């Protein structure tokens, strides 16, 4: 990519007719200027094209925690849910629904995969930079990984409050 300029697309939906994917769909470029707009890793493409754990859990269930976070600047909204085995404290299932760009969907998909089989306390150690590194997200898409981390914490808080436990202290990140 050296010698080429990249730019962030403010509307994450790539609606312009001038924008096209290259043959393996790893890059989005402007057809007229031939400037690469965004380059995605194979892992992002894989999670975007075949997202894992899309769906919902019963949010009224006592053992289900739901986190809903969003980034109004980009339009990304992420709902992530966890199901916890009350006897063991282990996360037995995780689901998500995300309205947003490929990086937001990939971050959600990866996060749900990582959550399954972890204890609630272990889940709190998932950091947005772990997601950035695993997916090789470009700097302009780091906010997507922050949303995933915030959604995890919000889901855990919802679960904890439903079960009479103290909520963890965290502030939803301001995403730019």
Predicted regions located by residue number:
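Short, thiol/selenol-centered motifs that function as redox-active sites or metal-ligating centers
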Residues: 74, 98-106, 144
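Alpha-helical support elements that line or immediately flank enzyme active sites
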Residues: 103-118
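Short, basic, low-complexity termini and linkers enriched in Ser/Thr/Gly/Pro
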Residues: 1-37, 174-175
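Glycine/charged-rich beta-loop-alpha catalytic/anionic-binding loops adjacent to active sites
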Residues: 85-96, 129-134
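C-terminal binding/interaction regions
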Residues: 38-59, 65-67, 118-176
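Long, acidic, intrinsically disordered low-complexity segments
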Residues: 50, 56, 94-102
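Structured beta-strand/loop patches that form or line metal/cofactor-binding pockets in enzymes
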Residues: 51-91
